[in-house]
Amino acid sequence: MAANKVIFEHVIQPGTGKAVEVRAGQILRIEQVEGGQCVDFNCFNLNDYKEFMHCGRTRTVHGFHPSKGTFLWSGPPRERAMMFILEDTYGRNDVLFPRCSAYLYESAYGFDVHTNCQDIQAEAQREYGLTPDDVHDSFNFFMCTEVSGPHRAQITRQESRAGDYVDLLALIDVLAVTNVCGADVMRTSNFSLKPLRLSVRPATDAERAAAPPTPILRSQRTPESFRVRNIKADRELRADPTYRPEFRNVPLTVEDVAVELSANEMAALAAVRQPIYGDDDGAALRDVLFSWWEERFLAGSSGAPVISNKADSP
């Protein structure tokens, strides 16, 4: 099959969404038809729906506004790169704000009936047997947000145009669920709702090679390592009478290490110590030590994995 041959195409209208199977090595394109439309996007492992795109993990690794050259990650315990943003012509996306919901529009705007991303997502993924409880927070493509002050973020108007697009390379088989964000009373899509075009095609060798390798670590868990492998089939929670705790890495041990400081060193500690520790010199010194270690030796910011671009490899 030719790498540029489109194998699926669909226009999603306002108020709707579409669940699409995208196999590893294929590219999903999400394209503006008229421009100015926010996209709520989610994806699941096609072979295990319990693994899905996790905004929190993606935000930790790539920041508030991931764009071209970043990944969509699943959450713990899998923590895998599921898709790679191969191209992003507008370059404004968001993983700060959650999906909008019917409750939001009734509580904040007084609309007891209103199109919303929760309901659209739930209906689109119902084709694959997933319930409204299986909806999770969206990756918001073409959504402009900013941190506006202490403890606050805000949505701003956007300037995407007809023909702007995002290309997502599937790294594993995924069910990609895209919907037209239902927020027509917010700046999200400039107070309007417009259609979007989806298409799927095979990636070229060069496009597949563009995604840098991500680490495969022993600490990543898969269902094979779970002590409970079967998914619960009922909704009520009941205690397992045969349960015996088997926590990892316990029992924990704490060892005191004596550290002698000179008068000058004590003065230096006093100058940088955090006041929260009061008179506890040991806690203050431990904070200084680990803060120093973080700044110099932590592999990635905020505990993010190190991702080396192939072009940077010797």
Question: What label would you give each PLM region?
Answer:
Residues M1-N249:
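Acidic, Ser/Thr/Pro
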Residues L28, A176, L198, V259-L261, ...:
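Hydrophobic beta-strand residues in large extracellular and virion-surface proteins
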Residues R244-A268, R273:
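Short Lys/Arg-rich basic patches
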Residues P251, K310-A311:
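Short hotspots in intrinsically disordered terminal tails
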Residues D279-V306, D312:
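Short, basic amphipathic alpha-helical segments that act as recognition/interaction helices
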Residues V20, L28, R273, L289-W293:
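Amphipathic alpha-helical interface segments used for dimerization/assembly
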